[in-house]
């Protein structure tokens, strides 16, 4: 039960994990798919042209980090959806529905929970208070150097874990769909990722994400329509026929089959819910619009697109039960699905649209990874150049040219590191990194952002101790947990018995921040509390906020 639970969770906790087997089992390499290769090359050619176009319009620091603030709310909503909707969601959740039925819907809802928090509590204030990174907001009335250092470290740890998982996921996915060598796939993704961000900055990254979102939504919509057409657009027929052909029968319509440990499930739920609001590459997108109103519209549109997409994956999963499961064309000699369960959506694409549509869906799956790694790389580069170099090392006195140069050097270094780690971790089960990334975002980044915006008694001392406490607790508990302590290090029993640390590390972060703030009687602390009123006025009105260019 534990193994089943873990392999299920590894499918969809992050956009990086585009496949179950890539992380938890054998990868079945597919024959070279020429149509998929052609469509992928068309996508790459188009996005490289966009990068060239964007490079001509990226002249300043604001252009590079935020596309000059000229992205509309609708465009940014699509881009956020493109950054968030993943190959993991498309292949992973549909695979879970194919294998276990109703439980897949529960996990897809888990991804949506965090967006109302961003919509109602974070988006507008973040846009009014910040400029390029969420550290601008966290350090608004606190001491710049320690807070920016903490925020940058939290961002870089999340980005690094995300990138490792993305690169391993990319290599395995391309091996599955295209038949290419794993190392070739990882190097290819790394090179494209660097090109997009190095030359096109946020403008190129945004349009890559928009194109990917449109392709993914279009492809998934077509698949869902074809599935519903096969049952005369009757959901009762879809579910009743699926129950008849599925080996588990009626149990696929019941929830709870994948939950073996309530504490781990609760901890994962907290990480997903609050970690989303602490992901640096998602938060960075709110600075690409002109004002708080457009930021709010961005989240509204993004939530709509993402919610619609997860409904589609549920239909696609049941469609695979109905149209792929009984079809021996998609099975091997042992009766198992070719390529593993996570190929269910890809086989369904073949079943409803033939080889041409199969090629399109394969290319879309690869495009999802390119869109996400581009956003991650830019978030990591901005944390180094804007937060660490310009604000900490140069104490806010760096010139724009030097800051951009540092950012671009960081992009190249991140690309090389991502390729190296992707190759290094090829044989590893890296699912634990996914849980750790969300847990760190929820335990370090989220508490700092939310408390700094809403609590007038916060001081630098409280934020520093609470933030580092959350970050270190998440890492230590993950190391002492069953995945690393037992599976990787080979000990008999874990010291920390649960899969995810967020339940405890978040509590540590919030309590630490609260306690060390209220006990801070220093003059600096008193001054920081007095500055809350001016921060509150700006966060509500936008007076003095950085403005984007004209749309």
Swiss-Prot record:
Any single GO BP term: plasma membrane acetate transport
Alphabetical UniProt keywords: Cell inner membrane, Cell membrane, Ion transport, Membrane, Sodium, Sodium transport, Symport, Transmembrane, Transmembrane helix, Transport
Primary site of residence: membrane
InterPro entries (alphabetical): Cation/Ac_symporter_ActP, Na/Glc_symporter_sf, Na/solute_symporter, Na/solute_symporter_CS, Sodium:Solute_Symporter
Domain of life (superkingdom): Bacteria
A Pfam family per the record: SSF
GO cellular component: plasma membrane
Compartment list: Cell inner membrane
Transmembrane feature ranges: 5-25, 34-54, 77-97, 104-124, 150-170, 184-204, 207-227, 263-283, 304-324, 356-376, 406-426, 430-450, 469-489, 498-518
Membrane topology summary: Multi-pass membrane protein
Alphabetical list of Gene3D superfamilies matching this protein: Sodium/glucose cotransporter (1.20.1730.10)
A molecular function (GO) term: symporter activity
Role this protein plays: Transports acetate.
Family: Belongs to the sodium:solute symporter (SSF) (TC 2.A.21) family.
UniProt protein name: Cation/acetate symporter ActP
Lineage: Bacteria, Pseudomonadati, Pseudomonadota, Gammaproteobacteria, Enterobacterales
Gene for this chain: actP
